[in-house]
């Protein structure tokens, strides 16, 4: 399943990020890619050795960790270190699949269950640059407002179309979920959404408490921590 997570960053935060990223050191994006991806990748990334990068990636981690909808959809166990990329002048990233595991500075290795892109450019400011994701439900083309995030299974083939006008800047990361299976995670997300909707409509009652108990028992049964 694919999820649109709105408002991860406020417009003020986005503007500040963009201003700081104008001063960043950018390097060839292929430095973080395996052999298959390097053949189809043509973009730039912020140098991960810079002081600015360390500050910005911490802000992204804090923002997603505090977003209730992100947590409900991803049920994250481990988040990768966020990266930042830039596309301009017809730069693109052809269809590829993300690696199943990635190194992690604290945990050694992590499994990539979900991929996330946090958009940092106004969609009207550039042409092209759509994230295209192929999954079991078909093909999805994504170009979200700045500050919004898209979450999708890392097992999906995906690409970024050429940016023919302007500049597309984004942050991206991977998530190891407490729930490995996409279908089970989607069921928990739907159940959680319905519980929250019923609580807002009717307040606390025995039926809602029973559903909440069911949610946590399923989470207890399926989670890997």
UniProtKB/Swiss-Prot annotation:
Pfam families: 2OG-FeII_Oxy_3 (PF13640), PKHD_C (PF18331). InterPro entries: Oxoglu/Fe-dep_dioxygenase_dom, PKHD_C, PKHD_hydroxylase, Pro_4_hyd_alph, Pro_4_hyd_alph_FE2OG_OXY. Residues 78-177 form the Fe2OG dioxygenase domain. PANTHER family: PKHD-TYPE HYDROXYLASE YBIX (PTHR41536:SF1). Keywords: Dioxygenase, Iron, Metal-binding, Oxidoreductase, Vitamin C. SMART domains: P4Hc (SM00702). The keyword Cytoplasm does not apply. HAMAP family: Hydroxyl_YbiX. GO terms for molecular function: 2-oxoglutarate-dependent dioxygenase activity; iron ion binding; L-ascorbic acid binding. Binds 1 Fe(2+) ion per subunit. It comes from the Bacteria. Fe cation binds at residues 96, 98, 158. Its EC number is 1.14.11.-. Its cofactor is Fe(2+); L-ascorbate. This is PKHD-type hydroxylase YbiX. 2-oxoglutarate binds at residue 168. It comes from Escherichia coli O139:H28 (strain E24377A / ETEC). One of its GO terms (biological process) is DNA damage response.
């Amino acid at each position: 399943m694919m999820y649109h997570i709105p408002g991860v960053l406020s417009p003020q935060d986005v503007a500040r990020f963009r201003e700081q990223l104008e001063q960043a050191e950018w390097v060839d994006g292929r430095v973080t890619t395996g052999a298959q991806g390097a053949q189809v990748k043509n973009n730039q990334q912020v140098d991960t050795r810079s002081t600015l990068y360390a500050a910005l990636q911490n802000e992204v981690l804090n923002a997603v960790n505090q977003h209730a909808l992100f947590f409900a959809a991803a049920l994250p166990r481990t988040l990768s270190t966020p990266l930042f990329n830039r596309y301009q002048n017809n730069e693109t990233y052809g269809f590829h699949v993300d690696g199943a595991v990635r190194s992690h500075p604290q945990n050694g290795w992590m499994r990539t269950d979900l991929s996330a892109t946090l958009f940092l450019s106004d969609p009207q400011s550039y042409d092209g640059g759509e994230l295209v994701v192929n999954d079991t439900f078909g093909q999805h083309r994504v170009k979200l407002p700045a500050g919004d995030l898209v979450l999708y299974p890392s097992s999906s083939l995906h690409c970024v179309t050429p940016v023919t006008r302007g500049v597309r800047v984004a942050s991206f990361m991977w998530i190891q979920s407490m729930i490995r299976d996409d279908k089970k995670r989607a069921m928990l997300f739907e159940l959680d959404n319905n519980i929250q909707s019923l609580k807002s409509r009717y307040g606390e009652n025995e039926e809602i408490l029973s559903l909440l108990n069911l949610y946590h028992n399923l989470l207890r049964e399926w989670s890997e921590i």
